[in-house]
Swiss-Prot record:
The chain crosses the membrane at residues 43-63, 109-129, 146-166, 169-189, 218-238, 249-269, 274-294, 295-315, 338-358, 414-434, 457-477. Belongs to the TDE1 family. InterPro entries: TDE1/TMS (IPR005016). This is Probable serine incorporator. Keywords: Endoplasmic reticulum, Lipid biosynthesis, Lipid metabolism, Membrane, Phospholipid biosynthesis, Phospholipid metabolism, Transmembrane, Transmembrane helix.
Length: 483
């Protein structure tokens, strides 16, 4: 309960700090005088990312069934309204005949976050500049929005458990998670190409740092390939013992796909049709796909688990890492080892939030909307500009004051509606990840189970497929413009 109080206390503290900004720009300048000036298009996205991070921590804590059940009792059991909801709802049936309080807590938190961003997405449809009266819903009113978000989280505990356990919400969560994963995979491939184009472009310019740039390009490629090879060897050594034939297939097939896309990227026909193709992109895609396979095989419900990954357990026991309430630190009935799964969960949680934040911010820009096939046309009033290029006409004294400069008076820098829509499906994706893709079991250990295994394995195959198509499409369809 202390963790819950501290988490929601953090939200309350953050809300209190935002009250000053609600009172006017002078208060912000007084509180943040030493901070550099920034634009509202940047500060707004950062603020929403922080809110999503705090909400994710709250959902993480809710994985402890005792915390979720205790919060429900403290907040609602003494409420007459909740008594009516509790005693009139149908009984929950699970394989163990025990209510999955941890999963229910996660679903309620992410349900609130999803509704919050869906509401803002609907309210900001068609906004073309900050002069629109609806701009305050997106760039301001932070204290009110924080109250609404926290209120939605608390209010979600009054909703019948059968709503979250039922098939309808499960399908909604699954569809939203799959949509976010597709966007995430497209951005991963795009990131690989952008990274390669950036470094190769500097080499072709012939700058003084060209030699260092070549060293960076080669070093990054070698390090990523070394990561793929090392992790693959370790997986073959630790995860292919006994009757682990399926894990053996997953690892071997992933290695074959990695070699295939790497060799394909070096084919003369591919290089001619797509000059930007290279081994760096293949290494980025292969590294992420190999991580997904490792995370999958570490969650296979069998005896195919080594006694490794002691570091996360050691750091957690010494207080350097927060306790992970959803990880059972003992072998499960299936014979799996919790140490390996703990490492997969810690790394997976970090990568999940990074990808959520990156995807939510990147997909809202005009260039990314075009790559996703969602650009609204050439007349779309979205300017993709460098926020640092905003002109400041104020005097020197005002420049020393912290101000959030409105750089969207003429046109918005990104699609506000699609920005919130991405956060909404990101909340559903994180909900499905934390609930092991909604297994609806009471004693669930996150990351364990065939649903989680197959989702991650198939995801690795889809990434290879998307990347392979980006290389072969210009060859197979030379008349089309893929720029």
């Amino acid at each position: 309960m202390g963790l819950v109080a501290s988490c929601f206390g953090g939200l309350a503290a953050y809300a209190a700090e935002s009250v000053a900004c609600c009172c006017g720009s002078a208060a912000c300048s007084l509180c943040c005088r030493s901070c550099p000036s920034c634009t509202n298009s940047t500060s707004t996205r950062i603020t929403y990312a922080i809110l999503f991070f705090l909400s994710s921590i709250a959902a993480w804590i809710m994985l402890d069934k005792d915390v979720s059940k205790g919060l429900m009792k403290v907040c609602c059991y003494h409420s007459t309204l909740f008594r009516l909801v509790l005693f009139t709802q149908p009984a929950i049936k699970t394989t163990t005949n025990v209510v999955p309080w941890g999963e229910l807590g996660v679903m309620r938190i992410m349900f609130s976050v999803c509704l919050f961003h869906l509401f803002l997405s609907l309210c900001t449809i068609g906004v073309s500049s900050s002069k629109d009266p609806r701009s305050s819903l997106h760039n301001g009113m932070w204290f009110i929005k924080l109250i609404l978000l926290v209120g939605a989280m608390v209010g979600s505990f009054f909703i019948s458990n059968s709503f979250f356990i039922g098939a309808s919400w499960s399908w909604i969560g699954l569809v939203g998670a799959v949509l976010f994963m597709i966007v995430q995979f497209i951005l991963l491939v795009d990131f690989a190409y952008s990274w390669n184009d950036s470094w190769v472009g500097k080499l072709e310019e012939g700058s003084k740092c060209a030699g260092f740039g070549s060293y960076r390009l080669i070093s990054a490629t070698v390090m990523l390939m070394a990561f793929v090879i090392t992790l693959t060897v370790l997986m073959f050594h630790f995860y292919t013992n006994g009757d682990c034939k399926l894990s053996n297939f997953f690892i071997g097939f992933n290695l074959a796909l990695a070699l295939l896309v790497t060799l394909t990227s070096m084919l003369p026909s591919v290089r001619e049709a797509l000059p930007s193709s290279g081994i760096l992109q293949s290494s980025v895609v292969a590294a992420y796909a190999t991580y997904l396979v490792w995370s999958a095989v570490s969650g296979v419900p069998s005896t195919c688990h080594p006694l490794i990954a002691v570091a996360p357990l050691f750091l957690s026991s010494r207080g350097f890492l927060p306790p992970l309430p959803y990880v059972a630190l003992k072998p499960a009935e299936c014979g799996g080892d919790a140490g390996t799964n703990t490492a997969a969960i810690v790394i997976g949680a970090l990568l999940t939030f990074i990808s959520v934040a990156y995807s939510s911010i990147r997909t809202s820009s005009k260039s990314q909307l075009g790559k996703l096939g969602l650009q609204q046309g050439s007349n779309e009033n979205i300017y993709l500009m460098d926020d640092k290029a905003a002109d400041f006409d104020e005097d020197d004294e005002d420049r020393r004051l912290q101000r959030v400069v409105d750089n969207e008076q003429d046109a918005v820098r990104y699609s506000w509606s699609f920005f919130h829509l991405t956060f909404a499906v990101a909340a559903l994706y994180l909900m499905m990840v934390l609930t092991e893709w909604d297994s609806s079991d009471a004693d669930v250990r996150i990351g364990k189970g065939w649903a989680s295994v197959w989702v991650q394995v198939v995801s690795s195959w889809v990434i290879f497929l998307l990347y392979g198509w980006t290389m072969m499409a210009p060859v197979c369809l030379p008349d089309r413009d893929f720029s």
